Amino acid sequence: MSTALLDINVLLALLDGDHVDHERARRWLEREIQSGWASCAITENGFVRIISQPRYPSPVPVAQAVQRLARATSTESHEFWPCSVSLLDERVIERDHLLGPRQVTGVYLLALAVAQGGRFATFDQSVPLSAVHGARPEHLLVL
């Protein structure tokens, strides 16, 4: 198994004990932890932005969200991946396969996982493999 880049929705589920998918995400990570997990600037910023919104079901202050994420990423099983691919690079992204704005971040994160030789773990069932050159089913893990 290869390292899994966790989508923002998976980070939220893992790091929010009140999240509806917390147990499912936790059980998955327990099974997969030996392969490692990754975050990047997009997923880290997205986690903090969403969980600190007043409308989020269990909001926390920004400082607490950052602290929670820092604790989670301080483990040996975590890697930080720099955002090293571009959505504009036609060698990476098949633009015609981006069907809507809600797919943009998922496709980008899948492309980053492919570039890193890893997997993209998400709850989002609408990420099209065909939008990323070289992406195969083993690169995308829908929890």
Q: What are these model-derived regions, one by one?
A:
Residues T75-Q125:
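Active-site neighborhoods of divalent-metal-dependent phosphate/nucleic-acid chemistry enzymes
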Residues A115, R119-L143:
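Charged phosphate-binding loop/patch that engages nucleotide di/tri-phosphates or the phosphate backbone
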Residues R55-P57, L99, E138-L141:
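Short, hinge-like loop/turn segments at secondary-structure boundaries
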Residues G36, S77-E79, E138-H139:
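Conserved beta-strand segments of alpha/beta enzyme cores
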Residues M1-S39, I51-Q67, V132-A135:
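Short, well-structured N-terminal submotif of metal-dependent ribonuclease cores
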Residues V10, T43, S86, S126-P128:
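Alpha-helix capping/helix-boundary segments
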